[in-house]
């Protein structure tokens, strides 16, 4: 579970990685220089090279995944919301316990749901 207002590392969450994937490499480097890439679990990305590969995959796929990288046993999918200019508004993610999620089905069902909600959010905030 998470507490409202709790701060989390961007590289460990689906929403955070979705946001990082929208940023230029220089901004990602700046963030990593300030926060580092601390491991939260044994699945957390802790190297710049691995993070760069993950962000490239997110850009191609259109959504980010968290495979127990922030908390053991939690699987999440996240997408970013942007302004027409391309500026990041934020991100939305949906998470569930690993034991209750069939990963492929989880992704297939939730990407269209997230797409719809992201579209509504972007339309309302423009």
List each model region and its residues.
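Cysteine/selenocysteine-centered motifs that mediate thiol-based redox chemistry or coordinate metal-sulfur cofactors
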Residues: 30, 36, 115-126
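Short, solvent-exposed recognition segments
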Residues: 1-70
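Extended hydrophobic
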Residues: 47-120
């Amino acid at each position: 579970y998470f507490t409202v207002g709790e701060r989390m590392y961007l590289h460990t969450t689906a929403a955070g990685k979705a946001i990082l994937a929208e940023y230029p490499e220089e901004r990602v480097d700046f963030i990593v220089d300030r926060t580092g890439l601390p491991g939260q679990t044994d699945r957390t990305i802790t190297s710049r090279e691995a993070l760069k590969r993950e962000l490239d995959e997110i850009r191609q796929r259109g959504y980010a995944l968290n495979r127990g990288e922030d908390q053991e046993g939690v699987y999440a999918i996240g997408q970013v919301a942007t302004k027409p200019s391309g500026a990041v508004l934020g991100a939305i993610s949906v998470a569930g316990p690993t034991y209750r999620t069939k990963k492929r089905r989880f992704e297939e069902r939730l990407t269209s749901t997230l797409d719809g909600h992201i579209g509504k959010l972007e339309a309302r905030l423009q």
